[in-house]
Amino acid sequence: MLNMNLQLLASKKGVGSSKNGRDSISKRLGVKRFDGQLVTAGSIIVRQRGTKIHPGTNVGKGSDDTLFALVDGTVKFERKDKKRKKVSIYPVAIAE
């Protein structure tokens, strides 16, 4: 008679890892100073990717398309044309 000795070794099936579970940190983009607010020269008005809003009077544009004030004054959001928006800074007249 045949005598079979069957032994099962301890084993664990390979378990795949999830492909989810990551997230990038937020970039904190958007409008930082709104229409009618007073700003000082150098203040960041809008942080953006691409020129969603274009620079107007007394507004500079950084290399990353950030818009900032070149003079002290009041923020004013306007239409550049039918499709485009712009932001300008109008200096406040100082009463003496």
From Swiss-Prot:
InterPro entries: Ribosomal_bL27, Ribosomal_bL27_CS. It comes from the Bacteria. GO terms for biological process: translation. PROSITE patterns: RIBOSOMAL_L27. GO terms for molecular function: structural constituent of ribosome. Keywords: Ribonucleoprotein, Ribosomal protein. Pfam families: Ribosomal_L27. The N-terminus is cleaved by ribosomal processing cysteine protease Prp. The keyword Ribosomal protein applies. The keyword Ribonucleoprotein applies. GO terms for cellular component: cytosolic large ribosomal subunit. Residues 1-9 form a propeptide. NCBIfam families: L27. Belongs to the bacterial ribosomal protein bL27 family. This is Large ribosomal subunit protein bL27. The gene is rpmA.
